[in-house]
Amino acid sequence: MGQASSHAAGAEGSATKPLSMLVAAVGVVYGDIGTSPLYTLKEVFSGAYGVPVNHDGVLGILSLIFWSLIWVVSIKYMMFVLRADNQGEGGIMALTALARRAAAGRKRLRTLLVVCGLIGAALFYGDSMITPAISVLSAIEGLGLAFDGIDHWVVPLSLVVLVGLFLIQKHGTARIGILFGPIMVTWFLVLGALGVYGISHYPEVLHAMNPVWAVRFFMVHTGMGVAILGAVVLALTGAEALYADMGHFGRKPIARAWFLLVLPALVLNYFGQGALLLENPDAARNPFYLLAPSWALIPLVGLSTLATVIASQAVISGAFSLTRQAIQLGYIPRMYIQHTSSDEQGQIYIGAVNWSLMVGVVLLVIGFESSGALASAYGVAVTGTMLMTTILVSAVMLLLWKWPPILAVPVLIGFLLVDGLYFAANVPKIVQGGAFPVIAGIALFVLMTTWKRGKQLLVERLDEGALPLPIFISSIRVQPPHRVQGTAVFLTARSDAVPHALLHNLLHNQVLHEQVVLLTVVYEDIPRVPPSRRFEVEAHGEGFFRVILHFGFTDEPDVPQALKLCHLDDLDFSPMRTTYFLSRETVIASKLEGMARWREALFAFMLKNANGNLRFFNLPLNRVIELGTQVEM
């Protein structure tokens, strides 16, 4: 009897796990694309585009939205992009690492793919500022339909919600995060119910599923042309989050949530809004809220605000995760990463990113004042990132997966053509307010490329005149210095030369430790390195050891913890016997070849303000000695 009960409980637990994963995925992954109905049709019919609210116009736009969701999300992302996981991890930086590995041996192609990845990552940060601003603004604007004269409170209330959201980031969202899934499931059920309510009044709107209406729209509205895709793309914002959050849930829960709940709810709601517009063209000023019965307006505003806050939280968390990956892949200066949960390694907080995003979001809300005005700036960053993702996935499919070109190329051309059209449709937005995310993206791209190139030049300068390790060991055999007890660990980027910190220590203190470890930390193009492959140890005699630690771009680089795995009889990493020696380089801009003087100055500034090895590698504060070196670049 007991065994039967246990078996039943286990069966019940295994049966409920997919459901719980689906609910959790809905709460984290689909907030952005799930809140798009708040403003998409409003922008199309009453915004800058001014599509006529008539039978052909409404059905044409609905058809474009429907088939965009099918082609871009259901086919491209669900069937292809989500398969391009880097050991389970997704996102533009994980994909860049995968594409870089796929292009091994092709230097120019490898460089081009890295540039595409950095452009996509830079644009993602611009999108991370716009998403919270437009989402929360569009939700709170619903109050204007319920109360007269409250419109001037929309901006202050939005700022209160958004600033409050950024202020709580440092404390983590683990406790309230368990509510995100149920709230977003409720949100999508409400979206679907509102859609059914609207469609029931005008069922003919379902004819928009026929792609002929999309084609007819382009034929009739030739003046708008491709430009209207700049508004339709608002329905696709958040598609990149499906891929970015894959590491948390896996491909299957994300796909199930999309096809079973999210896609049906979105389609029903868009079509319900379309039915309302066909029945009452004046509803174009805010078709989402006017679709609801008057008694449900206030609760709907409350639920919408919660949904947009959750969508914003997902974007902010995504920016934190992207930054950590970029740091460990060497594209961004090291920053202090604070873990906000003892249970979930992925829940982190990066202060510099948080405050930068908050300033950007506040400026956007104050500058644009409404979701309609902000929609004119939305789309450039989103479509740019989507286009870069398609380029990187193309490289992975052809070079890493070795798909036959006769099968892969036609599909990839279709993806690139659609993404290219959406991006081209959004380029004019740059002069309509879309310059903000583009400028932010360009600035971040310059910072990332300058940091990467600067670090390469710094290593080259330090290598000039470096003393090979075998020669140094031979010299101390001839003239052995005084040896003191304990283990000295010198962090160095090179595995075959003597670190500057070791030479400085020997020059000034005239001593060497009994055990000297030259430690190099290497980051792989994979998210996680198993413990069995964590380290390499090589003994060089005279108490010298070469240790190489390998980490993935999502691993926690805890050096003292990793060194405990180095099981070698001659090595002792006891905390009270181990001293870590670090080198702090100060860069001096010069006329030497390498980078422009302004980039050298920028790199010097970033290097000076970067988080040091001490905190980044979790080294014990009272066991670290830091020695300075000046380097001309």
From Swiss-Prot:
Q: What is its main location?
A: membrane
Signal peptide interval: none
Listed GO cellular component terms? plasma membrane
Record localization: Cell inner membrane
Membrane spanning segments where?
21-41, 61-81, 112-132, 149-169, 176-196, 217-237, 258-278, 290-310, 348-368, 377-397, 398-418, 430-450
Q: Which PANTHER family match?
A: LOW AFFINITY POTASSIUM TRANSPORT SYSTEM PROTEIN KUP (PTHR30540:SF79), OSMOTIC STRESS POTASSIUM TRANSPORTER (PTHR30540)
The UniProt similarity line reads: Belongs to the HAK/KUP transporter (TC 2.A.72) family.
Please describe what this protein does.
Transport of potassium into the cell. Likely operates as a K(+):H(+) symporter.
Question: What is this protein's record name?
Answer: Probable potassium transport system protein Kup
What gene name does this entry carry? Answer: kup
